[in-house]
From Swiss-Prot:
Residues with the Cysteine persulfide modification: 62, 120
Protein name: Peroxiredoxin AHP1
GO CC annotation terms, alphabetical: cytoplasm; cytosol; mitochondrion; peroxisome; plasma membrane
Protein purpose: Thiol-specific peroxidase that catalyzes the reduction of hydrogen peroxide and organic hydroperoxides to water and alcohols, respectively. Plays a role in cell protection against oxidative stress by detoxifying peroxides and as sensor of hydrogen peroxide-mediated signaling events. Preferentially eliminates organic peroxides rather than hydrogen peroxide. Relays alkyl hydroperoxides as a signal to the transcription factor CAD1/YAP2 by inducing the formation of intramolecular disulfide bonds in CAD1, which causes its nuclear accumulation and activation. Involved in cellular Mn(2+) homeostasis.
Residues with Phosphoserine modification: 28, 59, 116
Posttranslational modification: Conjugated to URM1, a ubiquitin-like protein, in response to oxidative stresses. The attachment of URM1 to lysine residues exclusively depends on the presence of a peroxidatic cysteine in the target protein, with low specificity for the particular residue, motif, or structural context at which urmylation can occur. The URM1-conjugation reaction is mechanistically and directly coupled to the process of cysteine persulfidation, transfering the sulfur atom of the URM1 thiocarboxyl group to redox-active cysteine residues in the target protein if it is exposed to oxidative conditions.
Predominant place of localization: cytoplasm
Glycyl lysine isopeptide (Lys-Gly) (interchain with G-Cter in ubiquitin) crosslink residues: 48, 81, 113
Record gene name: AHP1
Length: 176
């Protein structure tokens, strides 16, 4: 577990971008313009938020083992666990994230958003980045639960290339 637990969510001045998907355009190849959201606003407007970081859209572990769990359990998270938002964070651009979300079967972003963290700024601020080259950073594989503005769970995988343990939806469910 991280030293972020039991502390106020570290929103700072960080923002993310995502592209909304609705039932009417879920099967279309059209693309909308990205929306920019301040982390502080998202956290203040929602009582319970799950945030999970993934190294790369369309990568094998992210696409097969990590993110599908959140999509498969979304109804349970929202209806039974009263989660307001699930945010999937990568450093990929919002267009790639939207295409990835659609490829995973997301048809509505009311409760799940695929967020772009430009320059890995937010992820680096919480210490969950993954150095992949000379000054190049991706998001590590991690998960966080924020309830009423307080971090109640935060953990990062030690081997983000293959492991999906502390960042899995099952691990998050155990901490709700």
């Amino acid at each position: 577990m991280s030293d972020l637990v039991n502390k106020k969510f570290p929103a700072g001045d960080y923002k993310f971008q995502y592209i909304a998907i609705s039932q009417s355009d879920a099967d279309s190849e059209s693309c909308k313009m990205p929306q920019t959201v301040e982390w502080s606003k998202l956290i203040s407007e929602n009582k319970k938020v799950i945030i999970t970081g993934a190294p790369a859209a369309f990568s094998p572990t992210c696409t097969v083992s990590h993110i599908p769990g959140y999509i498969n359990y979304l109804d349970e998270l929202v209806k039974e666990k009263e989660v307001d938002q699930v945010i999937v964070v990568t450093v990929d651009n919002p267009f790639a994230n939207q295409a990835w979300a659609k490829s995973l079967g997301v048809k509505d972003t009311t409760h799940i958003k695929f967020a772009s963290d430009p320059g890995c700024a937010f992820t680096k601020s919480i210490g969950f980045e993954l150095a992949v080259g000379d000054g190049v950073y991706w998001s590590g594989r991690w998960a966080m639960v924020v309830e009423n503005g307080i971090v109640t769970y935060a953990a990062k995988e030690t081997n983000p290339g293959t492991d999906v343990t502390v960042s899995s939806v099952e691990s998050v469910l155990a901490h709700l």
